[in-house]
Amino acid sequence: MANEPAIGAIDRLQRSSRDVTTLPAVISRWLSSVLPGGAAPEVTVESGVDSTGMSSETIILTARWQQDGRSIQQKLVARVAPAAEDVPVFPTYRLDHQFEVIRLVGELTDVPVPRVRWIETTGDVLGTPFFLMDYVEGVVPPDVMPYTFGDNWFADAPAERQRQLQDATVAALATLHSIPNAQNTFSFLTQGRTSDTTLHRHFNWVRSWYDFAVEGIGRSPLLERTFEWLQSHWPDDAAAREPVLLWGDARVGNVLYRDFQPVAVLDWEMVALGPRELDVAWMIFAHRVFQELAGLATLPGLPEVMREDDVRATYQALTGVELGDLHWFYVYSGVMWACVFMRTGARRVHFGEIEKPDDVESLFYHAGLMKHLLGEEH
């Protein structure tokens, strides 16, 4: 088909124009203002703008300083909000929300998260806000090239080890969703908006995200039809239930693993309150998107991973909660993935990696899956 997305240069995505050579001195000066006794650390950049995903900058650092006569060496990770000129995926980045959620999850649950250390919210130091957290050693199923393409530690593992990782990741999600009274504990995520349901507020945010994405790349008739479908098929029962803490970008590509067990749950940019079905559907749908990518590359992918029946059964066994129908949430996830592809496509145009497409939907690697979910032919 003429508008079929091409795999092309998916193995190379430029995320930032930041000059990392200036970082050691800048971060050293800032750290001296937050470390005990005003210690002046020596800072080394271990890797530049690195990310398992396609959004915030992730910079790995080592800081060395003297404290109470002792030599301290700490490996840290800086999560830095992208600059507007680097075509960010999201309209806004609340790193303060991410920092506080990670801190609370670490305090309230046994879900493995990095220890968050310090946050700079003004943007005066690096040009945009950032926070520092402890570095955690682990491996992640890759996004680029997608883990479903094979030739990586997860795809090449025995099926029982893949299932072990899947179940452990669903268990982390189940634990997050079991934090009691999430609406009060994480009330800062509502930003004072208490009218309507959390799902309605989330939907309005996604609609504004799409409008933001359109500015850089053009409108999508498929997405606009999908928004109408979502409104006319609104999941009233799921929307009315007590909201839980949503990880947001809940998928295996945002977890560090050791021996097929999670050691750090990462990437909280989409954190929100809402129906638990949204996180579960996103986790399954994310794998389906990667399966679509494998299919476009004429590869078999990993069809036995993240099957809905398996994920549902594991989740219910751990929480005692029977999930509602996930179909609406798959369609909704498809819209959000399309917004990501619109913004990463606009970024690739900005950095000269591709020409601006005539048809924005040529960027949607999962367009066929979306049309199938909507009952449209493709």
UniProtKB/Swiss-Prot annotation:
Binding site for ATP: 79, 134-136
InterPro entries: ACAD10_11_N, AGP_Transferase, Aminoglycoside_PTrfase, Kinase-like_dom_sf
Keywords: Antibiotic resistance, ATP-binding, Kinase, Magnesium, Metal-binding, Nucleotide-binding, Transferase
Domain of life from the UniProt record: Bacteria
A molecular function GO annotation: metal ion binding
Entry keyword annotation includes Ribonucleoprotein: no
EC number(s) per entry: 2.7.1.-
Residues the entry annotates as binding Mg(2+) 1: 254, 267
GO biological process: response to antibiotic
Sequence positions that bind Mg(2+) 2: 267, 269
Enzyme kind, highest EC tier: transferase
SUPFAM superfamilies recorded: Protein kinase-like (PK-like)
Catalytic-site annotation from UniProt: 249
Family: Belongs to the aminoglycoside phosphotransferase family.
Protein purpose: Might catalyze the phosphorylation of aminoglycosides and confer aminoglycoside antibiotics resistance.
Protein's name according to its UniProt entry: Putative aminoglycoside phosphotransferase
Organism: Mycobacterium tuberculosis (strain ATCC 25618 / H37Rv)
